[in-house]
Amino acid sequence: MSTEENKAIVRRYREAHTSNNLALLDDIVAPDIVSHSGIPGFPPGREGGKMVHQMFLSAFSDGVSTTDDLIAEGDEVVERFTFRGTNNGSFMGAPPTGKKVTTTGISIFRIAGGKIVEHWGENDALGTMQQLGLIPMPGQG
């Protein structure tokens, strides 16, 4: 596949998450996708990824991710994204705070046969927890 076709797959991935239409993932994510940044306690593969999304949706029901950059080379696509949402449900064991968060992250996707088969992801988890008031900002004790 061309790099433009691979980028289109990642755009559909983001669309599936932003529109909460996770059925779209069945067409573009391999059932046995390897996630190098999975969250402990969730099963591996595509179904585990859907469960992680549902956890975020229940914590940030108005959450929206936007793609800021897409860079592709060979069978890999790098996405820089921004997530915005209001914490109106429990998140990682903490009760809802009602606070709005804006956080950024980077994902790397490897694509084979028209499907995402591997994923690496990093996001500003510390900044998110600070915005939620769950971890103090430096100098605030």
Place the predicted regions along the sequence by residue.
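C-terminal and inter-domain tail/linker signature
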Residues: 1-141
